[in-house]
A protein has these predicted regions:
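Pair of pore-lining "gating" transmembrane helices in MFS-fold secondary transporters
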Residues: 127-144, 234
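Juxtamembrane intracellular "pre-TM" segments in multi-pass secondary transporters
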Residues: 103-134
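Helix-to-loop junctions at the C-terminal end of transmembrane segments
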Residues: 180-194
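Helix-loop-helix hairpin linking two adjacent transmembrane segments in secondary transporters
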Residues: 46-47, 54-102
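Helix-breaking motifs and short loop linkers at transmembrane-helix boundaries and internal kinks
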Residues: 11-17, 214-215
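Cytoplasmic helix-loop-helix junction between adjacent transmembrane helices
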Residues: 15, 21-62
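Paired small-residue
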Residues: 4-8, 16-24, 227-232
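A late C-terminal transmembrane helix in Major Facilitator Superfamily
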Residues: 249-285
Length: 324
């Protein structure tokens, strides 16, 4: 489906065909995300699952940062259709790798599902623990989407960066997210998932403080410098890298026998909730940086609410595999 959608986009002759092709690509990406996340849940648990989810989320979050840079270079060199032909070839490569190396991960006792699992979705959504951690992911994604949406105006209009400089700053932050994700994955075995959630929450708060400090304590000219925006964003993105792996593993942990359904629901809450939070922030009639600071503060609050100090000892021990 992804290759078909990419080829349709490359061959599009009108807006309807182009938008339809992008929708087809979106559906196929959702399917692959569910497979990846449910496969991790099938094979791993505890800190190992958190490390794998952290890597997956780090990879997912680097794409919005690097895609404009790579796509822009391809489009400038070969025309606007070139990025979509590249995606079609990339999809073919991934298909070959799946056929060669991806085994079946589903446990033998997986619950069979016929049709749309609406009842399963509703039952999982009623689990307050699931919602706590799924909403942590939604908040982190909302922060990322808000940052991405506001960046062109803040960096190019206010800070005066050229398109190339903007792409480099964007790409550098993408590599930063991946680097912090790798670091978080390395230390999670030593400090545990609750500590990583706490670190992520504090980094979100630091990003919020940085934006507010720039808005209230610096002169207007200095406020528009690109680093005044990107340094707090870098802190918040580091917080995202620390939070999303543990939060995803906690959300999926009780659903070993229906990992696919739970993974799909985590993805839906993450993307839909993140998009709603981002749209709400951008709709506020205030300074864009202040909108982003509010989102960071909301993610900090959500992360703090998910920490074990706010749960009973018995429920936390049961839910987090003996606190690890």
């Amino acid at each position: 489906l992804y290759m078909l959608g990419a080829a349709m986009a490359a061959l599009a002759v009108d807006p309807v065909m182009f938008v339809s092709s992008r929708l087809l690509q979106g559906v196929s990406v959702c399917c692959t995300a569910v497979v990846a996340f449910s496969g991790v849940r099938d094979r791993l648990s505890g800190n190992e699952a958190a490390r794998a989810f952290g890597f997956l989320n780090g990879t997912l979050n680097i794409v919005p940062a690097l895609a404009p840079l790579l796509g822009g270079l391809l489009a400038e060199a070969f025309g606007w259709r070139a990025p979509f032909w590249f995606l079609a070839l990339y999809g073919l490569l991934v298909l070959v790798l799946i056929i060669m190396f991806l085994p079946e991960t589903r446990p033998a006792n997986t619950q069979p599902i016929n049709g749309l699992p609406i009842k399963n979705y509703l039952r999982i959504l009623r689990d307050s623990r699931f919602l706590v951690f799924a909403l942590v992911n939604a908040g982190a994604m909302g922060m990322a989407l808000t940052y991405v949406s506001l960046a062109p105006n803040v960096l190019m209009v206010d800070a005066g960066l050229s398109p190339l400089q903007f792409s480099l700053a964007f790409g550098a932050n993408g590599f930063w997210i991946m680097a912090v994700s790798f670091f978080a994955n390395r230390i999670i075995q030593k400090v545990g998932r609750p500590t990583c959630l706490m670190i992520g929450s504090l980094l979100m708060a630091l990003g919020c403080f940085g934006l507010l400090f720039g808005l209230t304590q610096l002169s207007v000219d200095v406020q528009h410098h690109w680093l005044v925006y990107m340094l707090p964003v870098a802190s918040a993105c580091a917080g995202l890298a620390f939070m999303m792996g543990p939060a995803t593993s906690y959300a999926l942990e009780p659903y070993a026998n229906e990992a696919g359904v739970a993974s799909a629901l985590v993805g839906f809450v993450q993307m839909a909730g993140g998009a709603a939070l981002g749209l709400l922030a951008m709709a506020l009639p205030i300074e864009p940086k202040l909108s982003l600071a509010i989102v960071m503060l909301a993610v900090y609050w959500r992360g703090k609410r998910a920490e074990p100090v706010n749960m009973s000892a018995a429920s936390w021990k049961k839910y987090t595999n003996n606190g690890k």
